[in-house]
């Protein structure tokens, strides 16, 4: 009987998985394989939160495969070595994998291809599995390889259209006797954020249904409301591929309305960042547009930012949410990033690395390029805009409920005064166990403008 290997990466699902479907068409039996790559461990990208969420995802994937007569094979080691070993053990002629956009993904694909070629085997790479529209599917006129501005990209993205979706297979036949390492166990992962969400395809699909049938209708008006949190919280599931971006686009449009269209636009933003990184993989850690910044380094200020003790309540609330949940509202991410890179004038890479250490949805394309967008080294057409945490608080947390939820030291402060506690007088200020601001906003803005040559 013919055998094919399916190497699961960022597509840990059975529904609408073109990689799995292609392998099932290709062979009588398939080997669903996940490799815990040593290269990821060496690079320090196996932080506790994403590792625990991954454990949930793999357990759910294995359960789904067993329900269909198969099982998940897990190996630990170098990806290329383990893939070749499994192919040789099972006699598989071809390996199927979803296309990635990061430098790591490119190196992994190349090494697997070379390892398989030594024994006459092939690697098949499938587009539009991780994203709704494949990077490079649409390109600007004039010889450029990617769009640097979202609006023209979105017009072409909409005109191109998203691929159709596929159902989950009814059966999956796996060869007998294929050895597997144990599945990773969430309960064995230490130092988790206490409010970390659960992962897995079933959890993701339930969240999709709940989102589409209710909160999405208010997304256009409420997505920036920090306390209301009218967001989907689907980003971890998109990152690990337990839900399909293409399926989300179709289902959101079926529901329709302004909320659905606004949500689809955010999915297109995700694709936008992936097509940038696919063409500019160096932008994961190098400036997309160099500004020749001479970044500051202050250990005390960096500690205050990471710990949620800057003295600016909205920034501190955001950072405490990140520590507790391994997730943060997008508006809060923008503010926290602006405060670090423009108010404190610290290298965006320092903040991006901290986010990747904690975020359960730490997608390299979206995390790094959003950090660059805020820092003014990325694709933003207004690179020197500075977000004021007081103004942002009064606009997007007008009653202060988001701050009160994460900064209990300020729970008794009434109204918009919660965003400027340093202005409280007498006993009202003395009774607060909350730090003074680490920096004066006006002085920090002037420093940034001098550094960027704007004064």
From Swiss-Prot:
SUPFAM superfamilies according to UniProt: Cryptochrome/photolyase FAD-binding domain, Cryptochrome/photolyase, N-terminal domain
Binding site for DNA: 392
GO BP, sorted A to Z: DNA repair; response to light stimulus
EC number: 4.1.99.3
Start and end residues of each Photolyase/cryptochrome alpha/beta domain: 2-131
Subunit text: Monomer.
This protein's record includes keyword Glycoprotein: no
Function: Involved in repair of UV radiation-induced DNA damage. Catalyzes the light-dependent monomerization (300-600 nm) of cyclobutyl pyrimidine dimers (in cis-syn configuration), which are formed between adjacent bases on the same DNA strand upon exposure to ultraviolet radiation.
Enzyme superclass (EC): lyase
Stretch list, region Interaction with DNA: 266-273, 330-331
Listed name of the protein: Deoxyribodipyrimidine photo-lyase
Protein source organism: Streptomyces griseus
Site positions (Electron transfer via tryptophanyl radical): 295, 348, 371
Key words, A-Z: Chromophore, DNA damage, DNA repair, DNA-binding, FAD, Flavoprotein, Lyase, Nucleotide-binding
Cofactor note: Binds 1 FAD per subunit. Binds 1 coenzyme F420 non-covalently per subunit.
